[in-house]
Curated annotation (Swiss-Prot):
<comment type="similarity">
    <text>Belongs to the ATPase alpha/beta chains family.</text>
</comment>
<dbReference type="GO" id="GO:0046933">
    <property type="term" value="F:proton-transporting ATP synthase activity, rotational mechanism"/>
</dbReference>
<comment type="subunit">
    <text>Has multiple subunits with at least A(3), B(3), C, D, E, F, H, I and proteolipid K(x).</text>
</comment>
<keyword id="KW-0472">Membrane</keyword>
<dbReference type="GO" id="GO:0033178">
    <property type="term" value="C:proton-transporting two-sector ATPase complex, catalytic domain"/>
</dbReference>
<comment type="function">
    <text>Component of the A-type ATP synthase that produces ATP from ADP in the presence of a proton gradient across the membrane. The B chain is a regulatory subunit.</text>
</comment>
<dbReference type="GO" id="GO:0042777">
    <property type="term" value="P:proton motive force-driven plasma membrane ATP synthesis"/>
</dbReference>
<dbReference type="Pfam" id="PF02874">
    <property type="entry name" value="ATP-synt_ab_N"/>
</dbReference>
<dbReference type="InterPro" id="IPR020003">
    <property type="entry name" value="ATPase_a/bsu_AS"/>
</dbReference>
<dbReference type="InterPro" id="IPR004100">
    <property type="entry name" value="ATPase_F1/V1/A1_a/bsu_N"/>
</dbReference>
<dbReference type="InterPro" id="IPR036121">
    <property type="entry name" value="ATPase_F1/V1/A1_a/bsu_N_sf"/>
</dbReference>
<dbReference type="GO" id="GO:0005524">
    <property type="term" value="F:ATP binding"/>
</dbReference>
<dbReference type="InterPro" id="IPR005724">
    <property type="entry name" value="ATPase_A1-cplx_bsu"/>
</dbReference>
<keyword id="KW-0406">Ion transport</keyword>
<keyword id="KW-0375">Hydrogen ion transport</keyword>
<keyword id="KW-1003">Cell membrane</keyword>
<dbReference type="InterPro" id="IPR055190">
    <property type="entry name" value="ATP-synt_VA_C"/>
</dbReference>
Length: 465
């Protein structure tokens, strides 16, 4: 319960999600504000800017129906905090942390600042160990590592929501002794999308190990600034207080950035690239950099932010700045989507910079690093030959070239493509990779050691059996 502090009735202006309060004293940046209307309705806000005798307040539930003359504003002297408890697992909340699943209010074990506790860089442990998503194009080619931040770059109309739900449902760490949880935060989604996520989690039982925060498209845009921070605060609590391995999925970060731009425009700030605020890089970093591991703690926070690239432009400020902060990207392809391939992950522009630290002997399998390199090289060769065929025709190709073409087609249809309910183990993924490489002459497998070929290639494996 917010304790009453200094109260004012000196609102001078309301515009967009913001209000200006005059004649204030001792107000601090980030301070929580309680706003009361003439009818007694209460809303929350936060100080966005504090000057000597004036404060700009962002109102989380929106400024609709607020009257300058009758609105009262109470400055609480506290920062914005979220109540946390293990009872949050299995629950669904709105964008500012209120239950929307018909269940009771959370009885908090603690209240944590939504901006998180400062973390000394020296205290960080290097991200290691494999997280299995059950999706071959990620596990085999762009492996997710505990403590990593690996975004998914999508486009409007591509099935990133299905992919997010599938990852949230299937993700696990190898080893039964590890406790795993998913914190899922959606920003600016439609009712249809919200129902899809609820249904996906509830019908599969994944809700039991998950916490959902859903900010809808018709909720005030200002709430989208708070939603990912609420989710990450809960994730930090589960990871560092209860030693859980937590996967945080944030979708759609483009909606978050649009809300940031809306607030910046309302404050009449000087715009940066394409109208986004000049501090967007720093703001995104305050979210993405909350992933990681801490020395002396068993838990970890792994992030998979999802963003839709406007006009499929990977140089747009949102994916561009995200790429600078994060450790790779998973890129969804419209061309693969048109072919009916799900998930339409294009492995060539995709990258996991920390993959090498989470795979190999003792983590996945000894042949994984070299196998993924060989698959990547063979698929790249097949893709380049497709362009050549469009010019000279398939008749001009050698027999080996035709095999590369066939490999590329099979790679997309059999390795990348899988059912929405298909959960492949890492060993199934690696064995499937070898099955596809059997399409090529053995002399072309130049990136894999001979000992691995003799051990895992289908020709020798079947002979050994």
């Amino acid at each position: 319960m917010i304790m009453p502090g200094m109260e004012y009735s000196t609102v001078s202006k309301i515009y967009g999600p913001l209000m200006i309060v005059q004649g204030v004293k001792g107000v601090a940046y980030g301070e929580v504000v309680e706003i009361e209307t003439e009818s007694g309705e209460k809303r929350k806000g936060q100080v966005l800017e504090a000057r000597e005798d004036m404060a700009i307040v962002q109102v989380f539930e929106g400024t609709r129906d607020l009257d300058i003359k009758t609105t009262r504003v109470r400055f609480t002297g506290e920062t914005l905090k979220v109540p946390v408890s293990m009872d949050m697992l299995g629950r669904i909340f709105n964008g500012i942390g209120k239950p929307i699943d018909g269940g009771p209010e959370i009885i908090p074990e603690d209240r944590r600042d939504v901006h998180g506790a400062p973390l000394n860089p020296v205290a960080r442990a290097y991200p290691r160990d494999f997280i299995q998503t059950g999706i071959s194009a990620i596990d085999g080619m762009n492996t997710l590592v505990r403590g990593q931040k690996l975004p998914i770059f999508s486009g409007s109309g591509l099935p990133h929501n299905m992919l997010a739900a599938q990852i949230a449902r299937q993700a696990k760490v190898l080893g039964e002794e590890e406790q795993f949880a998913v914190v899922f935060a959606a920003m600016g989604i439609t009712y249809e999308e919200a129902n899809f996520f609820k249904k996906s989690f509830e019908e599969t039982g994944a809700i039991e190990r998950a916490v959902l925060f859903l900010n809808l498209a018709d909720d005030p845009a200002i709430e989208r600034i708070i939603t990912p921070r609420m989710a990450l605060t809960v994730a930090e609590y589960l990871a560092f207080d209860y030693d859980m391995q937590v996967l945080v999925i944030l979708t759609d970060m483009t909606n978050y950035a649009e809300a940031l731009r809306e607030i910046s425009a309302a404050r009449e700030e000087v715009p940066g690239r394409r109208g986004y605020p000049g501090y967007m890089y720093t703001d995104l970093a305050t979210i993405y950099e909350r992933a990681g591991r801490v020395r002396g703690k068993k838990g970890s926070i792994t992030q998979m932010p999802i963003l839709t690239m406007p006009d499929d432009d990977i140089t747009h400020p949102i994916p561009d700045l995200t790429g600078y902060i994060t450790e790779g990207q998973i890129v969804l392809s419209r061309e693969l989507h048109r072919k009916g391939i799900y998930p339409p992950i294009d492995v060539l522009p995709s990258l996991s910079r920390l993959m090498k630290d989470g795979i190999g002997k003792g983590r996945t399998r000894e042949d994984h690093p070299q196998l993924s390199q060989q698959l990547y090289a063979a698929y790249a060769e097949g893709r380049s030959l497709r362009d050549l065929v469009a010019v000279v025709g398939e008749e001009a190709l050698s027999e080996t070239d035709r095999k590369y073409l066939k490999f590329a087609d099979r790679f997309e249809r059999e390795f990348v493509a899988q059912r929405y309910d298909e959960d492949r183990s890492i060993f199934e993924t690696l064995d499937l990779g070898w099955e596809l490489l059997a399409e090529l002459p053995e002399s072309e497998l130049k990136r894999v050691r001979k000992e691995y070929i003799l051990k895992y290639h289908p020709k020798y494996r079947k002979r050994g059996e």
